[in-house]
Regions:
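S-adenosylmethionine
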Residues: 1-278
Length: 278
């Protein structure tokens, strides 16, 4: 009945019911139908959030600070102008970026002058945030399997005034061999996934994603995660920190992937010290 009411494949609803109670499943599916507010991230390489907010408000934009955990996010309530085409946007004063996609970068907590790898980077939202937190120092390798997608990454870096990023296109699984003598202080793997956590952004997932897709993706994620761990410099003062994130809610693509890595590599889970996701 839920599948029919909300337009989902029955097998997907059944899958959600293996993870959540019926009430939670209904709440999740209902919430997934609701549009998210537009969010922008202030580019502190070029401006301050206060100044950006004032500039946008002068253009008639209604906005609020994003949340207590973000010093750079702004939530756009209403706008008479296209947010992706204002003079401030074109000048690189902000990036369109969802609140959820800022969280992995905060968990990664990159420091100035470090070596950082963003393993699945395009179109560069997280990469540019990493560069911003590093104050344009050190080096960030922005990798993506598809060279065509990197055009957007490079364009965004130029617009935002980011100068410490190197864009490359490799199969992440092969990177440990390619970078045999070059290791990283921190690695972010925002892995390719089924997208079951962002159905509001892509409603086609309701009918196009199957359990087979979830399992195939989970297999790829396990390979990528091991490769990401192998890219870490264990002699780094950080000890080598990596963040694994997805935009899926499935246990197969999250907890099970992490448990697999814990069984295959000498690593431990560390507390981010952040209160979201509790």
């Amino acid at each position: 009945f839920i599948a029919e009411l909300y337009g989902y494949l029955p097998e997907l609803v059944e899958y959600f019911l293996t993870m959540f109670s019926p009430a939670e499943t209904l709440e999740f599916i209902d919430y997934s139908d609701k549009p998210r507010p537009m969010v922008v991230r202030t580019n502190t390489l070029k401006t301050r959030r206060k100044d950006l907010a004032l500039a946008l408000m002068k253009r008639g934009v209604s906005l609020d600070p994003l949340a207590s955990w973000s010093k750079v996010g702004l939530k756009i309530m209403e706008s008479p102008v296209p947010i992706g085409a204002t003079p401030e946007y074109l000048s690189g004063h902000y990036m369109l970026q969802s609140a959820a996609s800022m969280c992995p970068v905060l968990a990664l907590a990159p420091e100035p002058k470090e070596r950082v790898l963003d393993m699945s980077a395009a179109p560069g939202g997280k990469t540019s945030y990493i560069a911003q937190l590093m104050k344009n120092t050190g080096v960030v390798f922005a990798n993506d399997l598809k060279p065509d997608r990197q055009k957007a990454t490079v364009a965004n870096m130029h617009r935002l005034g980011v100068k410490n990023v190197i864009a490359c296109s490799h199969d992440g699984r092969k990177m440990p061999k390619l970078f045999e003598h070059y290791k990283f202080d921190r690695v972010l793997l925002d892995a390719p996934c089924s997208g079951l956590g962002v159905i509001s952004r892509d409603p086609s997932c309701k009918v196009q994603r199957t359990i087979v897709d979830v399992m195939k993706t989970a297999h790829l994620q396990k390979e990528l995660l091991l490769a990401a761990i192998d890219m870490l410099n264990h002699k780094s003062k950080t000890g080598g920190v990596m963040v694994y994130s997805t935009c899926s809610v499935s246990v197969a693509e999250n907890e099970e992937v992490v448990n697999y890595a814990l069984s295959k590599r000498d690593i431990k889970i560390i507390d981010t010290g952040l209160d979201f996701g509790e």
